[in-house]
């Protein structure tokens, strides 16, 4: 699919007003559609929603999980894999396109692996490697921070746990850029990178990040997503507040990160920041950036009881702006956008 402006697609979402009876929905505009544009969202009830941006249909998948956080859709397998907090593992659901769009369907996993995770948070996929963060306080000491990263492999028979590494900080969101894994250092304004992550860390052991960089103006990093040179970071601010969240957009991210010394920070003037009461950002726990539409999708956990938000013109907007799309989804925990 060619490069498009997101506002051309919003009109298709007029039909989506049936998604919820909440008057909070704000979906309008003219539309020219093509290809596939599916937004997947997990929830803390275990339901997965798929919003068809072109048609306005919403499909509800009732999974075996009762709490999910993290999702990846594989067009090759016509399946999605979610991180199950209730099942403490991964679950894959197949033949997704075989169900009628707009239906509510009960699913059983094609295969799963359970029992390893304690408090899973995010999922990053590279080839047949499925990498999951876990922010469990291993020593139950609030003065010492640690987290874990679980590395699974997937084949036609299911998942296998290859190894688990322990980080020297609480870890939340993760994102691959090439072979390097970037991770949000929870409770800080920092991002860490592990170079050649999958090949350098094959054993169960404590690992040290190759570099940690702070971002000026950011309070508490939670989600991150990278595409075509642009990194979007979500800032939940104070966890108890539902109106102090923000998004930080960093263009030419790799060069700015490389130019900053470990322990240093990327200046505010090298970022775009979306924040303020008009944004409806309180606790943006997960984000997806799509460069074709130049849009940011946000899983907003607290404002309005839980919402999915979208911001148009992502690489040029800044300040206290209203989202271009908003609708209520209680318990939303992560989002994934598939387009072609």
Which residues are covered by each model-predicted region?
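Bacterial Sec-dependent N-terminal signal peptides
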Residues: 1-46, 53-55
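Beta-rich, blade/repeat-based domains predominating
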Residues: 24-35, 65-79, 114-129, 164-180, ...
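Conserved beta-strand positions in repeat-built beta-propeller and related beta-rich domains
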Residues: 33-34, 39-45, 74-75, 81-87, ...
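Post-signal-peptide N-terminal segment of Sec-exported extracytoplasmic proteins
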Residues: 37-79
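A short loop-to-beta-strand structural motif that recurs across blades of beta-propeller domains
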Residues: 47-49, 67, 89-94, 145-151, ...
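A short beta-strand motif characteristic of beta-propeller blades
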Residues: 56-64, 103-114, 158-165, 203-215, ...
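Short loop/turn segments immediately following beta-strands, especially the blade-tip
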Residues: 92-103, 140, 151-158, 194-204, ...
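Blade-level signature of beta-propeller repeat domains, shared across WD40, Kelch, NHL, RCC1
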Residues: 304-312, 317-340
């Amino acid at each position: 699919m060619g490069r498009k402006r997101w506002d051309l697609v919003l009109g298709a979402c007029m039909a989506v007003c049936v998604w919820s009876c909440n008057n909070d929905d704000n979906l309008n505009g003219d539309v020219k559609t093509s290809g596939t544009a599916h937004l997947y969202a997990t929830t803390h009830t275990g339901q997965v929603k798929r919003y068809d941006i072109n048609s306005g249909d919403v499909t509800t998948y009732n999974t075996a999980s009762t709490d999910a956080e993290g999702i990846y859709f594989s067009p090759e397998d016509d399946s999605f894999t979610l991180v199950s907090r209730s099942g403490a593992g991964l679950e894959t659901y197949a033949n997704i396109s075989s169900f009628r769009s707009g239906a509510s369907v009960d699913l059983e996993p094609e295969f799963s692996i359970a029992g390893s995770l304690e408090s899973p948070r995010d999922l990053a996929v590279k080839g047949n490697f499925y990498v999951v963060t876990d922010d469990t306080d291993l020593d139950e000491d609030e003065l010492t921070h640690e987290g874990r990263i679980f590395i699974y492999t997937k084949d036609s028979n299911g998942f296998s746990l290859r190894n688990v590494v322990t980080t020297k900080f609480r870890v939340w969101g993760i994102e691959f850029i090439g072979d390097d894994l970037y991770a949000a250092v929870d409770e800080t304004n920092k991002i860490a990178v592990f170079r050649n992550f999958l090949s350098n860390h094959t054993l169960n052991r404590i690992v040290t990040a190759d570099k940690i960089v702070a971002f000026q103006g950011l309070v508490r990093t939670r989600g991150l997503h990278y595409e075509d040179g642009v990194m979007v970071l979500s800032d939940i601010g104070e966890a108890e507040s539902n109106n102090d969240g923000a998004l930080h957009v960093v263009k030419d991210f790799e060069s700015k990160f490389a130019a900053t010394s470990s322990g240093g920070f990327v200046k505010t003037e090298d970022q775009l920041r979306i924040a303020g009461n008009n944004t409806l950002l309180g606790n943006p726990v997960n984000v997806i950036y799509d460069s074709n539409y130049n849009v940011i999708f946000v899983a907003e956990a607290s404002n309005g009881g839980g919402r999915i938000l979208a911001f148009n013109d992502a690489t040029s907007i800044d300040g206290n702006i209203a989202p271009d799309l908003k609708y209520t989804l209680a318990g939303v925990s992560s989002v994934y956008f598939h387009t072609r």
